[in-house]
Amino acid sequence: MVPAACMLLWALLLSLESRAAGAEDQKTNPTATTVRMQRVSFHFGGPARSLRSTNPTARTSISRKLRVTLEDENDALATADRLAVPAAAELLSTVTGYSRSSLSNSGDWEEDGSLEEGVVDTRKTTNNPITIFSTTNTVGSSSTTGRFVANSQEREIRLTTDMRSPSSKTTVDLSSETTLQQWSTPGSTPSPWPKPSLTAMPSPEDLRVVLMPWGPWHCHCKSGTMSRSRAGKLHGLSGRLRVGALNELRTEHRPCTYQLCTCNRQLEECPLDSSLCTDHSCSTHVASTISPIPVHLRRRPILPPTSPSPSPALAFWKRVRIGLEDIWNSLSSVFTETQPIERT
């Protein structure tokens, strides 16, 4: 029994000595293990991760490892890692990104999952918090209040811009007067639509010819005719038109009569007069006073004596006047055929 007990005691002592040696070795050289683990935990070339997106247990282990590394002041590798920590922090600060978990409302992102131009989506199918990093310094997604932060690499320089959310857009009334005032030629003063002038030319359907009463007859005994005219005006315009402007409409020519004109009966200046002394006394008076005129002496009508030809300039302007009156006559016929439209 004694030799067996001694053998068990000797084996127990050997096992305790090996454990003590291992613990002393780990205590004398803790930097190598910590540095090896720290090198695995830092990746400067990969995408930066937000602290919110990491596991709390991993965060505690990293802080514990950093604490052990910083307490060892005599190790060269620990010194190098301590000097590299500020550089790593500066590198992480230059990346303009934020965690998805920092958003208080998940409805700010578009329903279809699309992002703005210049934004890289690193979301995965896991349930962990998602981190979004922007590839530019001025592009970012809007938050719930419609604000985004630019130039976030410097904490002292922060730019906030107010933006309207898409849901706050209102429908613009295109027919409103204020909207019409904003639409104008660049460089000009905005002004509303001009109001209709009271003195402007009325529309064609509002114009109609109004003829005045007939004037007295004018006898032309030598030509055996008589004529009368009447003035006219266009309804809607002030003033009257020239009397001879519309010859076909406002000038009437008829054969002269002795009742209306003081023409010479002996010369038969009104040969087409059918009312030659309708009463019996007039016929007897005519028969007793004048003898019948031979047929070969009757001229219908008696032409005036030939006069010298007018000057070429006068003839030219006469033709111009006749042409203008013809044009006016054609226009006036359109007005007379068009029925006036009365506005209520």
UniProtKB/Swiss-Prot annotation:
Residues 1-22 form the signal peptide. Residues 162-197 are annotated as: Disordered. GO terms for biological process: regulation of cell population proliferation. The keyword Nuclease does not apply. Residues 162-182 have a biased composition (Polar residues). The keyword Signal applies. Keywords: Phosphoprotein, Secreted, Signal. Pfam families: PMSI1. It is found in: Secreted. Its main location: secreted. GO terms for cellular component: extracellular region. Phosphorylation sites are present in the extracellular medium. Involved in control of cellular proliferation. Onconcogenic modifier contributing to the tumor suppressor function of DNMT3B. This is Protein MENT. It comes from Rattus norvegicus.
